[in-house]
Amino acid sequence: HFSRLSTLRGLPEVRDVRGAGHMWGLEFAGAGARDGAAVACEVASRCFAAGLLVLQADNLIRINPPLVASDSEIEFVVETLCAAVRETLAAS
């Protein structure tokens, strides 16, 4: 699942995608008038609207799915996060 998140690395405002086990993080860089923190905040808001809670701190988003999460739940996390990032960057 982490390899799917890694595909976000090529996007212009995604500075880094990193993770170990079930702890993953995305770091955002600013572009134009928006700084990385604003991008991360918008991504977190889109995730929340879709039913996914993520931790946003400054320009970072951290995801910690439970170790007992099913494959379908992990798939939901990855799909929702990827969609939120792509929608946020497309709107800028």
Where are these regions (language model features)?
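Conserved N-terminal phosphate-binding loop of PLP-dependent enzymes in the Aspartate aminotransferase
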Residues: 1-92
